[in-house]
């Protein structure tokens, strides 16, 4: 509906005053900046997870939380996101609050460790100030904080071992996210917080699991992913990897409660070939007949491991299949986990916790 000339004139004067006071672009019509409507993303390294996220990856200019039990693949997933950002020509930073970063394994996940920025802060405030400085530089595309549980407030480090300091870490996270959220949006960086699980005492109904660092991160995160190891992969008696399931328990950019499964192998991280096979079969791009896998009339291999090996040896074919999958993915039905069936941390609608 068109505005009356008087209202249009008053609105133009108000917008002009706001621009003069706070800078050009402080207020704008969305129709004038249609390019900002598109959601920019960085792929996760797992095509199944890219589909589950609904937009093809983790959204830029947002806070993302990845949480799960120990050895579930949190750091591996974050390192694959870093690798994808670097492939796109981006700069990534890894804030290693746990002091457990393994550059050899990161390189196996595809990370260019020579150009990766790494910081091992002494306490939580230092870690978050470094994160803020990197974000405000507008030069970094991905910042990973590993992990929230290891962001120990300075007062706790300088105090005695038995001191009780309730709520200190939660207040630290709340203040940091208030300062960071605007800067993250303007810089178009993805800030990924890895988090651990704790058990709440005395919970009779629902999941007793909760994440560390208080409630603030749950609200500020646009995407929250629960990652779990569901199966151990073996070659005879030797363990070679794990089958992993990721549930998108909160998503502000697409419908939530979707899930993805993929293999994490000890020598390569997320198995790209295995993921392409699984999703290709689900979308009928790859045909499975008995033990054989086919692309059209061409055989890829007998058995999943042989087909994976064939794709690893023919990266151009793997790229073509991935392109076909991405072209068809948004129109394909994706399994959605009901919030009642979800055994993850209590969470999350589309827009609110």
UniProtKB/Swiss-Prot annotation:
The keyword DNA-binding applies. Disulfide bonds: none annotated. CDD domains: RecA. GO terms for molecular function: ATP binding; ATP hydrolysis activity; ATP-dependent DNA damage sensor activity; damaged DNA binding; single-stranded DNA binding. It is found in: Cytoplasm. ATP binds at residues 68-75. SMART domains: AAA. Gene3D superfamilies: P-loop containing nucleotide triphosphate hydrolases. The keyword Nucleus does not apply. GO terms for cellular component: cytosol. GO terms for biological process: DNA recombination; DNA repair; SOS response. It comes from the Bacteria. Coiled coil: none annotated. Can catalyze the hydrolysis of ATP in the presence of single-stranded DNA, the ATP-dependent uptake of single-stranded DNA by duplex DNA, and the ATP-dependent hybridization of homologous single-stranded DNAs. It interacts with LexA causing its activation and leading to its autocatalytic cleavage. Belongs to the RecA family. This is Protein RecA. It comes from Roseiflexus sp. (strain RS-1). The lineage of its organism: Bacteria, Bacillati, Chloroflexota, Chloroflexia, Chloroflexales.
């Amino acid at each position: 509906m068109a505005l009356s000339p008087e209202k249009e004139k008053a609105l133009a004067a108000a917008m002009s005053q706001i621009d003069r006071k706070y800078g050009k672009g402080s207020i704008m019509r969305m129709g004038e900046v249609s390019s900002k409507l598109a959601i920019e993303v960085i792929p996760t390294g797992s095509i199944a997870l890219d589909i589950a996220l609904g937009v093809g990856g983790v959204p830029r200019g947002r806070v993302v939380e990845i949480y799960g039990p120990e050895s579930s693949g949190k750091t591996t997933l974050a390192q694959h996101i870093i690798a994808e950002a670097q492939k796109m020509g981006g700069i990534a930073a890894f804030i290693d609050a746990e002091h457990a970063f393994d550059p050899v394994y990161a390189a196996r996940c595809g990370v260019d460790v020579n150009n990766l920025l790494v910081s091992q802060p002494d306490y939580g405030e230092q870690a978050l100030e470094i994160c803020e400085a990197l974000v405000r530089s507008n030069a970094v595309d991905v910042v990973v904080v590993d992990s929230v549980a290891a962001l120990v407030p300075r007062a706790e480090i300088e105090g005695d071992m038995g001191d009780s300091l309730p709520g200190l870490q939660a207040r630290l996270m709340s203040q940091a996210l208030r300062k960071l959220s605007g800067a993250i949006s303007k810089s178009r960086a993805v800030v990924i917080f890895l988090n651990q699980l704790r058990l709440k005492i005395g919970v009779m109904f629902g999941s007793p699991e909760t994440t560390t660092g208080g409630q603030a991160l749950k609200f500020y995160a646009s995407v929250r992913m629960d990652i779990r190891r569901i199966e151990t992969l073996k070659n005879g008696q030797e363990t070679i990897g794990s089958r992993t399931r990721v549930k998108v328990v909160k998503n502000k950019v697409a419908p939530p409660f979707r899930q993805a499964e993929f293999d994490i192998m000890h020598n390569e991280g997320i198995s790209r070939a295995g993921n392409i096979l699984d999703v290709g079969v689900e979308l009928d791009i790859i045909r499975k007949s008995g033990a054989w896998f086919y692309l059209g009339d061409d055989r890829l291999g007998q058995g999943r491991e042989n087909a994976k090996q064939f794709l690893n040896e023919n990266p151009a074919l793997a790229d073509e299949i991935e392109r076909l999958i991405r072209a068809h993915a948004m129109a394909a039905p994706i399994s959605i986990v009901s919030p009642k069936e979800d055994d993850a941390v209590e969470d999350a609608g589309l827009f609110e916790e």
